[in-house]
Amino acid sequence: ALFRLNARLTERKISSVVMPAGGCPFSTLRRRKLKLAHTSGLRICQDDAFSAFWSVLEQNLQQRHDRLPVHSLEEIVRLNRLFPEEIKLYRVLDKDETVGGCVMYISGEVAHVQYIASTDRGRDMGALDLLFDCLINQIYTEKRYFDFGVSVEDGGRYLNEGLIFQKEGFGGRAVMYDTYELCLDSVDDD
């Protein structure tokens, strides 16, 4: 164990994870928004129209958190071209307008949500509720974990309570991602 080697915990991040095979049900609020989404005529598409989603994402992050995505539009497009089976874009459309979506990173047992965003109208219409119901209960049912990603900032010192509340509403439960620091000079060879 790391603690026996005097490893030091440097950060603890909280992620929200669903186990599609037998995860927790959506909250009452999420089910209500899902019902609304089903009656609003929204549709989901998986494509490579990253520019349509990126404008929603950038505006959302700027307005709500005064931040930009970790990746630029050019970077995510390039990554998608290099890894088309591992990086996928899902958009929620109202007619032809992008009102929500997410970028997924796919690996052996995990479907990880890297970016999530919706417009104000998309939020009102339940766009993300429709999207995550589809992703968790139809598209990624064979994955062991559906990971919504972390809900903390500053190395785990600040919990974004609104964000974790939303993720728990979709059935996500907390999983800790710990980072340790180990000085290799102090480790014995035996």
Describe each PLM feature range:
Residues 1-122:
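A conserved beta-strand-loop-helix scaffold within acyl/acetyltransferase catalytic domains
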Residues 1-42, 148-190:
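Terminal substrate-recognition subdomain of acyl/acetyltransferases
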Residues 86-186:
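Aromatic (often tryptophan-rich) hydrophobic motifs at membrane interfaces
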